[in-house]
Structure formats: structure tokens, C-alpha cells
């Protein structure tokens, strides 16, 4: 994107990219069909269905779950190391080593992609109430847009801190007035969106709609947001609802949820959908050296009997010079055309969040916190914790965060977990990397700073 990234995101996202699903019945059929004018588009239920599909499509972007989040969240953490200063012109290496300049194009393009997605959802929510169609379907479309917008802003605020909070479709003139809102304002908007989504979304889908956001996914994401804000008591009811619903469960083996032949399984609450062939695959671990460079300390953190250890081992790719982590291995893939879905919310994540929240509200030597934590451990073939081993709130907190690292490795959680628990600087120090305190959030892309040219309302993050 050029220097008008955010401005362009709010004026061209619908006509240039949003309607990638026109005339398609299956929301995974993401081939472009038409690019109608936005002013004339939102007239029927089918129009809104296509627009919602376009919002899902945005998440697939190479600048989000299709690639760059891997750099921004995993390579930034103590899970993955980029050892090649020349990798992608140094873009990933600089992020891995906390020396990225404000002109880093990974940051610029991810920012632009996230705000393009925000505008897609804004346009849906702006226009949907003015069109008459089935109330249940309308509520679902609103819920899907609210869920996706909440997820987009959750990623924005965790990556950059204060960000522009834009909740309506805008013009270039409007965009020039945007300011960077406080983190608390952004989180309040996320909570509002996800709370509404818990009501508007159905619990399950059938047929071609399986894989869309559900009320359970909205509850889990809302709980994750609340825990990030340290609102542990508020998160517990949402997590308890998911656990008690009976809709989700741990699969028998830790690797089962990731199999390309096992999509939409009972452990997945929400995943970004990919499908090998044409425009619908991804190249997450291909064409990079990151797949080759799992941090040795991550592998060392697993006990030998842990069934999750092989998932972070590198696997040679047929007919390709690269290797990929087994967790995301697709034996039928080719470079940049991988069919694995990318998990955003898994039931194992829910159980660990539930254990964490319960412990933060009050440590107990028995009960649901230990039960939830140990369910994840025993599925992995490692011994359950006892109250003798984990005897205090502090010890339990450490145990949960360590378990999250082992269970959710390479799933775009580790850096966020380190930052929210205040342990990022110490964790990276163990890998030989010194993290300046200001680099717990990324610099605002320089292109945004330049185009706004307003140090009062649109300042750079401190220290950059």
C-alpha cells in the first residue's frame, strides 16, 4: 500500500476487495466475481451475505493469518528465531531482533489489511438495518460482522496500543480527522461488539455454513479479551458457558485438530479457512526461513514424553526445499498453496483461559482450575499437576502460562501472552535478546504518521 494506507482502506475496501464472494453460495468460495459500486450494492440479503463473506476473506490475507502474524507474534516471541539478516530484505529479522524501523513494510501492510477489514464490517453494520429481510438471518450477519470487527480490533490494539477507533464507513475526508484512541476506548468497543455477537450468532451451523463464527466463538473471544484486560471475574461466566455447552471437546491427540483432513472438528471454535487450489490456499510457512528456525528453548520446554513435541519439529515438504512445523504440515500441499485452516480459537485455549481466570480470582487446591489445566496436560501424555506441585496462586499462574506456550505454540498467542503477563522482557532475555520496554508494542507505520502529519492526535509510539 502507498502512504495513504488507512485513508484508502476506508474508501476503497468494498469496491476493490470486499465483494470477493459475489454470486457464491459457499463462504469459502472466494474467487472474485464482480466489483459493484458500494452505493448501489447493499440492497438484498444476498448482497449482505456476499459482503460478510468478504469480511471473512480479509482474515485470510498474507498480511494477517496467512503469513505476517507469524512474524509479528511468533518470531517476536521466544518460540521462533529468524537467524538470517537478509530474510525478506531483513524485514522479519528486524522484527525478531527488536530493531524494526518505522518504515518496515510488514507493519505497514498488516495495519492496512486490518483496517481494510474493519471497513468491510463497518459498511455491513452501517447499512444492514435499512434493508428488509429475514430477521434471524439479519441478526446472524450482524453478529458475524461484529465478531470479525472485534477480532480485528483485538489484534490492532495488542500490536499497536492506541489506534484509531473507527466504527462507521468513512470517506477520505472523514479519515483525515481520525485520531489514535486510548486503549481503554478500543477495548470497550471490542467488548460491545463481541457481547452483541454472543446474542446475534447461532450456536452451530449446518452444511456449507459450518466454520462461520458462532455464539460459542464469540463468548470465548470475549473472555480472551477480558482476560487480556485482567477482568478475570467477568471472563469466567463466558468460559463456563463454553465448557458446559457440550459443543466442544479435546480431540484424542494433540495433533488431530490441525489435520487438513479433519477440518471443522469439535476442538475448533473458530479458524480462518483455507482450501488448497486456486486463490484459497496459503503459504504461511513456505518461502521463509522461519519454519526452519524453531527456537531451541521451545523444544527444550517439552518433556520427552509430551505428544506435542513432534508438532514443533520440522518436517520436509515433498518436492520443496523447505521444511515446515508438523503442526501445520499438509502432505498434499505445494508452495503458497496450503490447505490447513489456521486456528484462532481452540477448546484447549478455552480450558487454559478458564483455569487462568479461576486461579486469578482465587486459588483453590481442587476444583475446575486444576481440572481444566490437567485435561490439556493429560491429553498430551504428561502427568497431571497436583496441589503439592502447584501450591500457590503464583505457581499456578506460571504453570498455566507455561502450558499455554506448549499447547498453543506457533498459533499466534505467545507474544501476546508474554506482554499481557508482564514477562516478555525476562523471557526474551533468556534467548539472548534485549527487549527495550517501548518495543512491547510496535511503531505506527511511518506512512501513517506522514500522511496524518498531526503529532497531537496521531503521534508515533514512544521511543520510535
Predicted regions mapped to residue ranges:
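Sec-dependent bacterial lipoprotein signal peptides
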Residues: 1-21
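Acidic, glycine-rich segments characteristic of secretory precursors and extracytoplasmic regions
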Residues: 2, 23-74, 123, 184, ...
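Long, intrinsically disordered, low-complexity segments
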Residues: 22-23, 56, 64, 77-88, ...
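Conserved, well-structured interaction surfaces
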Residues: 37, 49-53, 57-63, 85-160, ...
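Short, surface-exposed recognition loops and adjoining beta-strand edges that mediate ligand/DNA contacts
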Residues: 39, 66-88, 166-168, 201-284, ...
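TPR-repeat structural position
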Residues: 232, 364-366
Amino acid at each position: 500500500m502507498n502512504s495513504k494506507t488507512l485513508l484508502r482502506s476506508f474508501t476503497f475496501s468494498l469496491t476493490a476487495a470486499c465483494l470477493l464472494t459475489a454470486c457464491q453460495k459457499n463462504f469459502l468460495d472466494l474467487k472474485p466475481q464482480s466489483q459493484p459500486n458500494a452505493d448501489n450494492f447493499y440492497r438484498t440479503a444476498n448482497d449482505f451475505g456476499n459482503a460478510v463473506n468478504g469480511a471473512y476473506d480479509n482474515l485470510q490475507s498474507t498480511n494477517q493469518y496467512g503469513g505476517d502474524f507469524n512474524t509479528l507474534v511468533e518470531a517476536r516471541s521466544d518460540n521462533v528465531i529468524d537467524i538470517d539478516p537478509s530474510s525478506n530484505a531483513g524485514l522479519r529479522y528486524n522484527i525478531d531482533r527488536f530493531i524494526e524501523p518505522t518504515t518496515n513494510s510488514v507493519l505497514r501492510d498488516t495495519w492496512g489489511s486490518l483496517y481494510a477489514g474493519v471497513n468491510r464490517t463497518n459498511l455491513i453494520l452501517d447499512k444492514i438495518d435499512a434493508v428488509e429481510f429475514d430477521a434471524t438471518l439479519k441478526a446472524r450477519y450482524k453478529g458475524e460482522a461484529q465478531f470479525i470487527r472485534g477480532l480485528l480490533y483485538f489484534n490492532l490494539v495488542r500490536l499497536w496500543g492506541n489506534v484509531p477507533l473507527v466504527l462507521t464507513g468513512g470517506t477520505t475526508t472523514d479519515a483525515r480527522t481520525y485520531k489514535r484512541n486510548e486503549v481503554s476506548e478500543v477495548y470497550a468497543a471490542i467488548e460491545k461488539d463481541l457481547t452483541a455477537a454472543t446474542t446475534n450468532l447461532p450456536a452451530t451451523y449446518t452444511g456449507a455454513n459450518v466454520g462461520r463464527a458462532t455464539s460459542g466463538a464469540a463468548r470465548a473471544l470475549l473472555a480472551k479479551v477480558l482476560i487480556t484486560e485482567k477482568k478475570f471475574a467477568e471472563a469466567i461466566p463466558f468460559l463456563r458457558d463454553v465448557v458446559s455447552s457440550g459443543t466442544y471437546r479435546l480431540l484424542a491427540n494433540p495433533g488431530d485438530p490441525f489435520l487438513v483432513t479433519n477440518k471443522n472438528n469439535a476442538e475448533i471454535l473458530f479458524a480462518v479457512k483455507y482450501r488448497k487450489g486456486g486463490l484459497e490456499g496459503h503459504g504461511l510457512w513456505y518461502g521463509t526461513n522461519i519454519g526452519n528456525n524453531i527456537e531451541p528453548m521451545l523444544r527444550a520446554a517439552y518433556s520427552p514424553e509430551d505428544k506435542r513435541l513432534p508438532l514443533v519439529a520440522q518436517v520436509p515438504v515433498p518436492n520443496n526445499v523447505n521444511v515446515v512445523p508438523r503442526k501445520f504440515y499438509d502432505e498434499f500441499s505445494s508452495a503458497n498453496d496450503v490447505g490447513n485452516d489456521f486456528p484462532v480459537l481452540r477448546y484447549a485455549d478455552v480450558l487454559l483461559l478458564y483455569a487462568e481466570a479461576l486461579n486469578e480470582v482465587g486459588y483453590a487446591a481442587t476444583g475446575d482450575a486444576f481440572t481444566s489445566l490437567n485435561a490439556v496436560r493429560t491429553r498430551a501424555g504428561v502427568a497431571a499437576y497436583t496441589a503439592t506441585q502447584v501450591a500457590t496462586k503464583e505457581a499456578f499462574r506460571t504453570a498455566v502460562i507455561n502450558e499455554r506456550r506448549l499447547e498453543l505454540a506457533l498459533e499466534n498467542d505467545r507474544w501476546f501472552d508474554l506482554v499481557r503477563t508482564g514477562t516478555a522482557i525476562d523471557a526474551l532475555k533468556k534467548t539472548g535478546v534485549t527487549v527495550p520496554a517501548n518495543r512491547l508494542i510496535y511503531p505506527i507505520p511511518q506512512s501513517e504518521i506522514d500522511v496524518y502529519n498531526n503529532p497531537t492526535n496521531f503521534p508515533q509510539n514512544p521511543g520510535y
